[in-house]
A protein has these predicted regions:
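Short glycine- and basic-residue-enriched patches
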Residues: 1-110
Length: 110
């Protein structure tokens, strides 16, 4: 599968532990990408949104988001603290074919 420019930027952000600012569904988001890959042939990312806007209320401290990368615009990488939430109780269902996962070091060496 050929990777989009957005996918490559999210990949770089994971490898370099950079924050991302972007527009998703018309809302400004500030997030850290955690799991990157594909589901149903679509480029997807499980990310932790820690600031910015949302269609729903963003809880204090942030929230997990499943992003369809085709809907992401205006991606910028920046330095800053890495955020990934405190709870990892549920198995993620956002990405079926995992390319990178910050929690699985072997994927970071590909």
């Amino acid at each position: 599968m050929g990777q989009s420019t957005t996918y490559r930027l999210f990949r770089q952000a994971i490898l370099e532990r950079k924050q991302i600012t972007c527009i998703y569904n018309g809302k400004h988001r500030e997030l850290c990408p955690i799991v990157l890959g594909y589901k149903d042939g679509q480029e997807k990312c499980l990310a932790y949104q820690f600031a910015g806007e949302s269609r729903s209320t963003l809880p204090r401290g942030g929230e997990w988001r499943c992003l369809e990368l085709a809907k992401v615009r205006s991606v910028q990488l920046r330095d800053g603290p890495w955020h990934e939430g405190r709870q990892h109780r549920k198995t993620q269902a956002c990405v079926d074919i995992v390319d990178l996962d910050v929690n699985i070091p072997a994927t970071l060496r590909r």
